[in-house]
A protein has these predicted regions:
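An acidic, low-aromatic, low-complexity terminal/linker signal
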Residues: 1-158
């Protein structure tokens, strides 16, 4: 994920090295830098715990570790539609966190022509959009998962 070889997304896309993972939230297609995602987990039960904040869907048992699973859809003014969401597992600081999405799609390598810096629309969600990429013939928001998770930190130490 963010080892010694981590370079900013803009640098990598300028050299045809940037990859994104596409996913759906609330019927909308989005993407994020694949280097931010350790793995995608599907068909696993998220266990609800008492007294959890609304944004925390529960915890996922992953190789003996309890990983908190967060619903970021409200930050995008969307709503998760899947009964059993796919989970993008990421690390923020030293905390492993799952991000619930309706479905995870393919990993795509981008050319420089397929990436544009984020336009400002004036919406609150602008703070989470780092760019726009062309996927499946459409312009798609490139999201900063780290910034979304910093909005309301959750999780336990790794």
């Amino acid at each position: 994920m963010s080892g010694d070889g981590f370079r900013p997304f803009r640098e990598r896309v300028a050299e045809d090295e940037a990859q994104v993972i596409a996913f759906r939230i609330g019927g909308e297609l989005h993407a994020c830098d694949v280097q931010l995602v350790e793995e995608v987990v599907t068909k696993r039960k998220v266990h609800r715990l008492p007294d959890m904040p609304p944004r925390l869907l529960g915890v996922l048992r992953l190789r003996g570790e309890l990983v908190p699973v967060v619903d970021v859809a409200p930050l995008l003014e969307l709503r998760l539609e899947a009964e059993q969401p796919a989970i993008l597992v990421t690390v923020v600081g030293d905390v492993r966190v799952g991000v619930a999405v309706d479905a995870a799609h393919e990993v795509v390598t981008l050319s420089p022509a397929e990436y544009r810096p984020a336009p400002l629309s004036g919406a609150e969600r602008d703070q989470f959009v780092v760019g726009v990429v062309r996927l499946e013939g459409k312009l798609v928001s490139l999201l900063d998962l780290g910034e979304m998770l910093r909005e309301q930190p959750v999780g336990s130490q790794r």
